[in-house]
Amino acid sequence: MIFSTLEHILTHISFSVVSIVITIHLITLLVDEIVGLSDSSEKGMIATFFCITGLLVTRWIYLGHFPLSDLYESLIFLSWSFSIIHIVPYFKKHKNHLSALTAPSAIFTQGFATSGLLTEMHQSEILVPALQSQWLMMHVSMMVLGYAALLCGSLLSVALLVITFRQDIRILCKNNHFLNKSFSFDEIQYMNKGNNVLQNTSFLSVRNYYRAQFIQQLDHWSYRVISLGFLFLTIGILSGAVWANEAWGSYWNWDPKETWAFITWTIFAIYLHTRTNKNLQVANSAIVASMGFLIIWICYFGVNLLGIGLHSYGSFTFSSNL
């Protein structure tokens, strides 16, 4: 009873704190001068990290096994992973744009985990024989950490594509506007218009420079985070293969979860290849990463809804896991 009450308290505290953090982020987006608020949001995510850590440890002690045996626990661990990705650059004093993604991602996953849909899974249950293994912690934790990093990196790539697309549309519209005006006036008016265009161009060049710098930063952090997530995903798949051989007598069975995990791994392997290829534009790799965002959710959550395969321990009751 004590552990259950403590878990309930930590769950609501972490959810409330991360909600406040998102509010602070929205305020700092509107008012850049308030430096103290930005620092408060970072400290809020640190508090969220410790609350979720306490929640996981409490559930670990209460249940007697590592809390990654069902969808509820894996979502809490996913929220914990988002908070880690958020605070690590903060301690390293690196400025990045992950904070705009990790805080909403954390509140989304934790909000869904604590919703009424998964209420039955909050109670303790005896592990099925297939999950009673020392590989549970290694395999599932690596997979969830990989999902978290890949989701963050993919969202950065989506943001990169949106900014690049808007920039291309704006440049195209300005060029068409300039051409139309150029051929509709006489020569003197054209020269005056040309001088104005040069002045506007100097202003736009500065703005385009900062936009290009921002796009470069998005690409840089997307590549770093996806590379880390790809490493975690690879370790998770390999450890899962070893576990599968011990449990089922085969390293690979091509059930839905394994198939989509392989598809996810392939998509991000293609991303890393296109990203390191200097002959290809940045947008090409960003498109691949954006596709990977949808693939991850299919692999992590969508396949569980099918209720089939070796990785399904319960059908549409949300009692399945990775």
From Swiss-Prot:
Is Hydrolase there in the keyword field? no
User: Any one Gene Ontology biological process term?
Assistant: cytochrome complex assembly
Gene Ontology, cellular component aspect: chloroplast thylakoid membrane
Its membrane topology, per UniProt? Multi-pass membrane protein
Family annotation (InterPro entries): Cyt_c_assembly, Cyt_c_biogenesis_CcsA, Cyt_c_biogenesis_CcsA/CcmC
Write out the entry's keywords from A to Z: Chloroplast, Cytochrome c-type biogenesis, Membrane, Plastid, Thylakoid, Transmembrane, Transmembrane helix
Pfam families to which the protein is assigned, alphabetical = Cytochrom_C_asm
> Subcellular localization, per the record?
Plastid, Chloroplast thylakoid membrane
Instruction: Cite the GO molecular-function annotations of the record.
Output: heme binding
PANTHER family referenced in this protein's UniProt entry, alphabetically? CYTOCHROME B_B6 PROTEIN-RELATED (PTHR30071:SF1), HEME EXPORTER PROTEIN C (PTHR30071)
Question: How is the quaternary structure described?
Answer: May interact with Ccs1.
**What exactly does this protein do?**
Required during biogenesis of c-type cytochromes (cytochrome c6 and cytochrome f) at the step of heme attachment.
> What name does UniProt use for this protein?
Cytochrome c biogenesis protein CcsA
Which organism encodes this protein? Answer: Vitis vinifera
